């Protein structure tokens, strides 16, 4: 397994945000995390990425205890595309992408030919040439999200985490970038974990699902194991109509 969480909990001022979360995630799978607002999804993501280390229980990423792993070492294993971006300096797109290579270089050493090659290839693949003279600060929210998707690929980690990372994207770029991530799962056997609010978008790309409500995991498994009326009603407190094709859910409607 790539990721293991054992009885993970997290509280703020006595209020439980996560309660005894236990998960085992495998290599080469696309996981969709679903749940209502305030369920604890982003908190779980922050713990997985080592951003929040004030939790109870244990988290292992590729066999390494997250609490005992340095941020630099962890950033060679897992990359993250957040929902919100805070850039207060006029970096160019290439400069932001080059930050994705930082975990791979030694302190006070220059970037290598490979570093520049990786950045150039992804820069061109994403069509960023038109932003050559534009700072990332000047870009729209959706354009910035595309830059950080690209940075996650530049980082070349076996695990990629997306925390509502398509929230500012139109439908074209949402599906284009999620297709890129799906290809990473299929061709490079990477593990992608993505928080979704749109169930139908998740259906298009995910192999497995994690349902979270009130800080607890209410269901895990593949589509057949999770996407049923009972699980969805318990997750969102409402009824759904599930449209199937060839015994597979293709659309879920209220």
Q: Predicted segments — roles?
A:
Residues 160-164:
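Catalytic Walker B motif of ABC-type/P-loop ATPase nucleotide-binding domains
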Residues 34-36:
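The feature captures the beta-strand-to-loop junction immediately N-terminal to the Walker
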Residues 98, 113-131, 156:
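Conserved ABC ATPase "signature" region
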Residues 49:
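Helix-to-loop junction immediately C-terminal to a conserved catalytic motif
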Residues 57-65, 74:
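Conserved ABC transporter NBD signature motif
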Residues 135-139, 143:
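Conserved ABC ATPase signature
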Residues 3, 18-20:
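Conserved structural motif at the start of ABC-family nucleotide-binding domains
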